[in-house]
From Swiss-Prot:
Gene Ontology CC: one annotated term: cytosol
Protein residues bound to cob(II)alamin: 18, 72, 74-75, 103, 126-127, 214, 249
InterPro entries per record: Cobalamin-bd, Cobalamin-bd_sf, Elp3/MiaA/NifB-like_rSAM, rSAM, rSAM_horseshoe, Tetrapyrrole_Bchl_Biosynth_MTs, ThnK-like
Highest taxon of source: Bacteria
EC number, as in UniProt: 2.1.1.-
B12-binding domain residues: 1-144
Binding site for 5'-deoxyadenosine: 212, 312, 349, 384
Gene from which this protein is expressed: tokK
Name of the protein described by the UniProt record: Cobalamin-dependent radical SAM methyltransferase TokK
Record keywords: 4Fe-4S, Antibiotic biosynthesis, Cobalamin, Cobalt, Iron, Iron-sulfur, Metal-binding, Methyltransferase, S-adenosyl-L-methionine, Transferase
Pathway field: Antibiotic biosynthesis
One Gene Ontology MF term: 4 iron, 4 sulfur cluster binding
Organism: Streptomyces tokunonensis
Recorded family membership: Belongs to the methyltransferase superfamily.
Ligand binding ([4Fe-4S] cluster): 206, 210, 213
Length: 681
């Protein structure tokens, strides 16, 4: 089958928008499955998918004489796509508008009353329903209500069709990659100089039923897999088409025994043909030996962007409320140690605002994860209410006191109408976490991200925990309390600005979810020397603000230690670790050619790698040549933009792997007999 097919009359358009360039896999899957029907292949002319965001009117104008308009709807594209459908329907009233995807409600309710330009909703898996819709449309008097898995508009009411049909346990659908259907999208991205992700499925389904997520309910839980031969051929396609970035869309990669074989095949393609260069994946929720082996395989092949050790919350009452089972903190600690022994980067994702979560349990959870050894990457997201999530019922919302705000997703272009601005219902208050507690909790974790994950206080806090018994929660709560009362300090100004911003964030729905920093002129001005981005995050801003006032920050940090009963002037070890903590940070003047060294009274790299703390005069020499996942970013002395890429990487995809500070594995530690001094090469 060729992607360049002769015109056959009935035009089919797909729209599936994303702020980031993801290849339109859904459109390809729907098309190739439908075209197995010879009648459909003969009657319809499938157009190139609309997947790159443009002004709504421009996208609508590009849809010319459509017979069918298919929309793949997610929370990040729903409003714009509805507006495209409305404009197209006004111009071409006979077009059949079909909306599918996770944002289409399982229970139509008043959907068609709100969106009368949509004709059909496709629920769940779309291939079978879409093919039957196209086949039905070819009849003289099409009756779409007979198609399984759809709801059909009749006036403003919904007529629900028969139960949906699903693909078999061994999915044998044609591959849009192998049939050339994706070639046009790849060419478009490359012509525009866009870094894109190739989306890829190896299996479908999720056996879990977390109440905040719609994945398990949407896929009806049963795991089904694509054919082995097809997957191997697609891996070769990715490699031969020099696809740099691959996103595996499975809900739980590593849950199936063959997933390790797939991982080896990708690593072999990377080694033999040079691509893919980077793999993003949703790892299996309950991490196991297979996930470790996959991570090790990709780490060794320089493919891995990090391994998820899932949590969402550490509180048992919260986990019960969201129907979630975790791996347990003891097992989590063992996994952290296992991955750390192989220098494999891990990260843990938490959700703020879950049912039953209090400010105390949230902060204690952060502390317990740091105690368990996750010092590099804690990620926290606000709880959003998805249309088809089990949590999204009137009973659950009332039970837990979930109060939401319809947040804008992005900083929209000037003049963007409200009906084109994407929104997401975000939980900003619950019975267990009032608004002020939500604000303070979010400020707390953001500071932990740029101070601890970002390395400014990581080694100091580990030292204080191990040698002085000062727990991580106490240390970071103390920081917040002390500096919030001192607005004239670097951290004090950051804490108070975050508090003010998050109160505004709740009160002002137009303040965006994804581009919050870019919406604030003062924050954008702070970051201007480091480059222009729409995707700056709060922890990016905090980290770079400290980089700007680096020496002042360290002076003020010493003042805070006095509140803990600590005096560096009278504690040689504390003074030594403070110097090490300052020296280990990546700075704008660092030269890969010259390197950097300093001398200490203790072997701090050895200590923080798990050794004993003994007096030992050492020289620590760093020779890092590049930073970030896969070593993509090389710093240039005095070049703030190059420094920023090396220090924090890109805003998307997010990865804290190999950023912020010098790495022990690149350091040379030499024993000395001479007096201890510091120097820079």
């Amino acid at each position: 089958m060729s992607a360049e097919l002769a015109s056959r009359g009935r035009k089919v358009y797909f729209v599936g928008l994303n702020e980031y360039p993801f290849l339109p896999l859904v459109a390809g899957l729907l098309r190739t499955y439908a075209e197995q029907d010879e009648r459909i292949a003969a009657a319809y002319d499938f157009q190139e998918p609309v997947f790159l965001v443009a002004p709504v009117q421009e996208m609508a104008d590009g849809i010319v004489e459509p017979d069918v308009l298919a929309l793949s709807c997610y929370v990040w594209n729903f409003r714009r796509q509805m507006k495209v459908a409305k404009l197209v329907k006004e111009r071409y009233p006979n077009v059949l508008v079909v909306a599918g995807g996770p944002h289409v409600p399982d229970r139509p309710g008043n959907f068609f009353e709100k969106h009368p330009y949509v004709d059909v909703l496709a629920h769940g898996e779309g291939e079978v329903a879409f093919r039957e819709l196209l086949a039905t449309r070819l009849s003289d008097h099409p009756d779409y209500t007979a198609v399984p898995g759809v709801s059909v508009r009749r006036g403003t009411e919904a007529v629900v069709g028969p139960k949906a049909k699903r693909l078999p346990r061994l999915i044998d659908t044609p591959s849009p990659y192998l049939l050339g259907v994706m070639d046009g999208a790849v060419a478009t991205c490359r012509e525009r100089g866009l870094r894109f992700y190739a989306l890829w499925e190896t299996n479908r389904g999720c056996p879990y039923s977390c109440s905040f997520c719609d994945w398990g309910s949407a896929t009806m839980s049963t795991l089904r897999k694509f054919e082995d031969e097809r997957l191997q051929d697609e891996i070769e396609w990715f490699a031969r088409h020099d696809v740099e970035d691959l996103f595996i869309c499975d809900a739980n990669f590593g849950i199936m025994p063959r997933d390790l074989e797939i991982a080896h095949a990708l690593a072999e393609a990377r080694g033999e043909l040079g691509a893919p260069r980077q793999v993003r994946v949703n790892f299996a929720k309950n991490s196991n030996d297979r996930v470790f082996d996959i991570s090790k395989t990709w780490h060794d092949a320089d493919l891995l962007m990090g391994t998820t050790l899932s949590m969402q919350s550490t509180d048992m009452d919260v986990l019960e409320a969201i129907d979630r089972k975790n791996i347990g903190l003891d097992n989590y600690r063992k996994l952290q140690q296992r991955y750390a022994a192989e220098n494999i980067h891990t990260y843990t994702e938490l959700i703020l605002g879950l049912p039953m979560e209090t400010a105390r349990s949230f902060r204690d959870g952060i502390g317990s994860l740091l105690e368990a050894g996750n010092h590099e990457d804690l990620r926290v997201y606000e709880l959003g209410i998805l249309p088809n999530a089990p949590l999204n019922t009137p009973e659950k919302i009332e039970q837990y006191g979930l109060r939401t705000v319809p947040k804008r997703m992005y900083v929209e272009r000037p003049g963007t109408p409200d009906d084109e601005a994407e929104t997401f219902e975000m939980v900003m208050e619950t019975n267990a976490m009032p608004r002020d507690a939500w604000v303070e909790s979010f400020s707390f974790i953001q500071a932990v991200q740029f101070l601890h994950n970002g390395c400014y206080t990581r080694y100091l806090s580990i030292f204080l925990r191990q040698e002085h018994g000062i727990g991580y929660t106490r240390f970071y709560e103390g920081l917040q309390d002390y500096f919030t009362g001192r607005p004239d300090t670097v951290l004090g100004a950051l804490y108070l600005r975050m508090r003010s911003l998050y109160h505004d964030y709740i009160d002002m729905p137009a303040l965006p979810l994804a581009n919050l920093v870019a919406s604030q002129p003062d924050m954008a001005a702070d970051l201007a020397p480091y480059g222009r981005r729409r995707g700056w995050t709060i922890d990016n801003w905090g980290w770079l603000r400290i980089a700007t006032d680096f020496d002042r920050f360290h002076t003020e940090l010493r003042e805070y230690l006095a509140t803990l009963g600590l005096d560096p002037a009278g504690d040689a070890r504390l003074e030594d670790v403070l110097r090490f903590q300052q020296d280990v940070m990546l700075r704008p003047d660092y030269s890969p050619e010259l390197g950097k060294s300093a001398e200490y009274a203790h072997d701090w790299p050895g200590y923080f790698a798990g050794g004993l703390l003994r007096p030992r005069r050492v020289r620590v020499a760093y020779g890092d040549q590049s930073f970030g996942a896969n070593g993509r970013y090389r710093p240039v002395p005095g070049d703030l933009k190059a420094f920023t890429m090396a220090a924090i990487g890109t805003s998307y995809p997010v990865s804290r792997m190999g950023h912020f500070c010098h790495r022990f594995e690149s350091a040379e530690v030499t024993s000395l007999a001479e007096p201890v001094v510091s120097e820079q090469w």
